[in-house]
């Protein structure tokens, strides 16, 4: 069936207007301190994340004399020590966004919520990482790893979505740029961690 003139007119009138994609103001981005903070936060978060992804199994399996947990790779305990923190990480990432939204709906300003969840997330992670370095109980280490992942998940409601607050029209580009900076940490952190382990044979320095 062919469209009638009235239908064609309706389609043209209701069609979304064409807007040219705005150019990215790179110079302004470099000078924009909030965006620089997002990029730094992404870099730091990825540094710890990819260090754990790369070396957590090795840490759990490493002999106690070398600062590891001494858990056999084929044991169920090893799977437990690796799996539980990962599950907690997934759940906390989802809940972190809901937490930030809930605080904003309660009347807290967006900027205070973003700063608050970032502060809790990063300072909390730093504290629990420090505690792991002196812990020799597997259960306590797993609990601390879970708490670290909870703190990292809380940050999902902070720098993880802050791009949309700074420039709604440039959200995709901002995420791409900060994500690219974060991937530099993803490349470097396993290399640095491996080098430090080879030189010092100490896990406490890694944490």
Locations of regions flagged by a protein language model:
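Juxtamembrane intracellular "pre-TM" segments in multi-pass secondary transporters
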Residues: 2-38, 70-75
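Extracytoplasmic gate region of multi-pass secondary transporters
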Residues: 30-97, 152-160, 164, 189
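Conserved glycine-rich helix-kink/hinge and helix-boundary motifs of the Major Facilitator Superfamily
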Residues: 39, 79, 83, 119, ...
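Transmembrane alpha-helical cores of Major Facilitator Superfamily
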Residues: 43, 83, 87, 146, ...
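Interfacial helix-cap and linker-helix signal at transmembrane-aqueous boundaries
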Residues: 60-61, 99-100, 104, 192-201
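A membrane-interface helix-boundary motif in multi-pass transporters
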Residues: 75, 113-116, 194-207
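A late C-terminal transmembrane helix in Major Facilitator Superfamily
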Residues: 93, 167-200
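C-terminal transmembrane helical hairpin of 12-TM major facilitator-type secondary transporters
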Residues: 111-158
